[in-house]
């Protein structure tokens, strides 16, 4: 039972981190950007900076579940990647 609680807690934390990362990734305009600077970093290895811009287009427009789809308020919505 203790292992089940621990696994559930780890799963919830991982899911929260994934959701937070997805929220931050969707907040950028115009695709992926990687602009970083290592300024004012004294020391031998303290100014290292590695960034990887990743753009994954995902459409989540009008997603809902209904028995009668015509009466669905999301019926006819259009989602397009530019």
From Swiss-Prot:
The small chaplin mixture (a cell wall extract of an rdlA-rdlB knockout) forms a stable coat on a number of surfaces (including Teflon and cotton) and emulsifies oil-water mixtures, which could be useful in medical and technical applications. Coiled coil: none annotated. Residues 41-81 form the Chaplin domain. One of its GO terms (biological process) is cell adhesion. Induction: Highly expressed in 24 hour cultures while still submerged, during aerial hyphae formation on minimal medium, decreases once aerial growth ceases. Strongly induced during aerial hyphae formation and sporulation on rich medium, under control of ECF sigma factor BldN; more strongly expressed when sporulation is blocked by deletion of whiB, whiD or whiH. Expression depends on bldB but not bldA, bldD or bldH (at protein level). It is found in: Cell surface; Secreted, Cell wall; Fimbrium. Keywords: Amyloid, Cell adhesion, Cell wall, Fimbrium, Secreted, Signal. GO terms for cellular component: cell surface; extracellular region; pilus. Residues 1-27 form the signal peptide. Its main location: other. Disruption phenotype: Essential, it cannot be disrupted individually in a wild-type strain; the lethal effects of its disruption are suppressed by loss of some other chaplins, the roldet protein (RdlA and RdlB) or by inactivation of the tat secretion pathway. Quintuple knockout chpA-chpB-chpC-chpD-chpH has strongly delayed aerial hyphae formation, makes many fewer aerial hyphae but no effect on viability of the spores produced. Further deletion of chpE leads to more severe effects, and on rich media few aerial hyphae are produced after prolonged growth. One of 8 partially redundant surface-active proteins required for efficient formation of aerial mycelium; the short chaplins assemble into a hydrophobic, amyloidal fibrillar surface layer that envelopes and protects aerial hyphae and spores, presumably anchored to the long chaplins. Chaplins have an overlapping function with the surface-active SapB peptide; chaplins are essential on minimal medium while on rich medium both chaplins and SapB are required for efficient aerial hyphae formation. Chaplins are also involved in cell attachment to a hydrophobic surface. The mature protein has a random coil structure at acidic pH, rapidly changing to beta-sheet as the pH rises (examined from pH 3.0 to 10.0); at pH 6.7 and higher forms amyloid fibrils visible by electron microscopy. Belongs to the chaplin family. Short chaplin subfamily. This is Chaplin-E. It comes from Streptomyces coelicolor (strain ATCC BAA-471 / A3(2) / M145).
């Amino acid at each position: 039972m203790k292992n089940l609680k621990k696994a559930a807690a780890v799963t919830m934390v991982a899911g929260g981190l994934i959701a937070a990362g997805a929220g931050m990734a969707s907040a950028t305009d115009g695709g992926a950007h990687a602009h970083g600077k290592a300024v004012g970093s004294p020391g031998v290895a303290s100014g290292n900076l590695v960034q990887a811009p990743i753009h994954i287009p995902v459409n989540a427009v009008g997603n809902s579940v209904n028995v009668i789809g015509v009466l669905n308020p999301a019926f006819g919505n259009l989602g397009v990647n530019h």
